[in-house]
């Protein structure tokens, strides 16, 4: 399980504080029809309002696919992870059935590629 390595830095470390901050940023908007969105992944104090504006308009879905860069160059350039993500709001589980379907010639499971990454931690 991946720990919240940037909790308390990129976003509040406690669930209560994080919920309060998210409630202040997320405002219900009319959903838009889309297949994807580009969302910033910096600390909430820098880009939280922009990310929240995008998330508020995304259609509801059972699974969201998060794609981020391999900042450090370790492991495969396009890698999947089986790890769950512990967050101040609870645990986010990966959709392993979808990940297995995506796994193949250019995408594969590689925890090394994810070990030092922090960008998805402010998105999950």
Predicted regions, residues:
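Active-site histidine-anchored catalytic micro-motif
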Residues: 1-122
């Amino acid at each position: 399980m991946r720990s919240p390595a940037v909790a308390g830095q990129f976003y509040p470390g406690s669930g209560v504080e994080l919920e309060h901050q998210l409630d202040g940023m997320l405002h219900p908007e009319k959903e838009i029809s889309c297949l994807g969105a580009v969302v910033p992944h910096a600390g909430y104090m820098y880009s939280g309002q922009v990310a929240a504006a995008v998330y508020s308009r995304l259609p509801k879905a059972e699974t969201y696919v998060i794609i981020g860069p391999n900042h450090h160059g370790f492991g495969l350039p396009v890698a999947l992870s089986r790890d769950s993500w512990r967050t101040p709001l609870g645990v986010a589980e990966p959709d392993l059935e979808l990940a297995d379907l995506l796994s193949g010639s250019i995408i594969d499971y590689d925890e090394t590629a994810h070990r030092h990454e922090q960008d998805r931690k402010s998105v999950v």
